[in-house]
Amino acid sequence: MRENGFPAPKFSTTIPKGDDRARAVCDHCGFIDYQNPKIVVGSVALWKEKILLCRRAIEPRKGFWTLPAGYLELGESVEEGARRAAWEEARARINIDRLLAVYSVPRISQVQLMFRATLESENIDAGPESAEVDLFDWDGVPWADIAFPTVGWALRQWRESRGFTEFPPYSNPVEGL
């Protein structure tokens, strides 16, 4: 018994009726603790054709460059989450243009949504998870030091979508993960 008078939950792993995979199920009340993918939201944000990148100050891939992105919080829209991530990582205010891509990263149970965006100003500064932030023209992107495959995909797909106002969202390239 816990201090609040409720029994401490005890879970067993079983396949619930009508399901096709093992889940953690409460032995007392039958509650099913579904483990679902995490949603990551971010942006390819520009200031006058220069791309905002953040050098990671944390693991994984500390010291490598990434786009401003982060986990979606409860109660946020995906657009709100992308704006918050840009602020937290680069102290950048962004205007979302449109959805650029949706990536599936099953090996780490993530779904990533990347937006095309513009910076409201060139005033940027490293947030607590960034060692530094900078604006890069296309030829100056530090390709050898990009943190994750999805960052490279988003950058290339942003470039491919330039000049288009309507296009279906991109997804994982054929080579996948």
Predicted regions and their residues:
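Short, low-complexity, intrinsically disordered N-terminal peptides in bacterial proteins
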Residues: 1-6, 173-177
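Acidic, metal-coordinating catalytic segment for phosphate/diphosphate chemistry
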Residues: 2-42
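Short connector loops at helix/strand junctions that flank enzyme active sites
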Residues: 21, 36-40, 46, 60-62, ...
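Conserved hydrophobic/aromatic beta-strand scaffold that supports enzyme active sites
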Residues: 23, 44, 53, 114-116, ...
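Surface loops and adjacent helix of pleckstrin homology
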Residues: 38, 56, 146
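Unchanged
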Residues: 72-157, 161-167, 175-177
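Conserved Nudix-box catalytic region and its N-terminal flanking loop in Nudix hydrolases
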Residues: 46-88
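Well-ordered beta-strand scaffold positions
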Residues: 31, 49-50, 92
